[in-house]
């Protein structure tokens, strides 16, 4: 049925995978670059689906039903388990294929490329405390104010930096030679950070009870919107304006790229009222899809 399909796509984090691919394709169009190999985009789709679903691995029949998403994972735990297994195997196969195919190009990459790749990988590992919680007793998911910026940074790296590294591997050309990608990276970093802050609003009651010092817990809902989200959106908009001026965007191009910022601003003010979980999964994440399409 329609509702089951919606639940599967959004609760199962498949929409997140679509967003990762769309943002990466948007970057290529914005910078006028060739697209990456299809197999890379398949791997890019699978990786965030696997990663975001990991947070729900411990849900079982005895887990209290906190919301519709928890209920869906509890009712579909076998489907989730085997789909995770299948996607992990496929993902390993894809990246093994890419390494084998481009081995000579990969080993000739500058050290900075490896630093970026492993840096993002370690942030991802530390975010869920896969290693850090056992060794150091912490994870980045509980890092308070920095949490949203970390999420935004990782998303911006996946959307703007990894595709450029992959293009270097595929073509042998350096696509970091201009400053254009920097302004696009900053815009996406701030945009995705705002998106993460708005998602924290969804978890405001539980984060407050767990003493997680997110922006909304620290400053309250209204101050977070007016003094955190709005300034970050303005900073992201300034970065985009610089990018648009350098690229000499037409009025139509500029106007289309403004739409996601205006939508995000409207959504931010709508957060003054409580909404269902679907509002956060469809509307808030959906604005990232709008951003990719408008780009």
Stretches found by the model and what they are:
Residues 2-31, 35-44, 218, 222-236, ...:
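Catalytic cores of Mg2+-dependent Asp-rich isoprenoid enzymes
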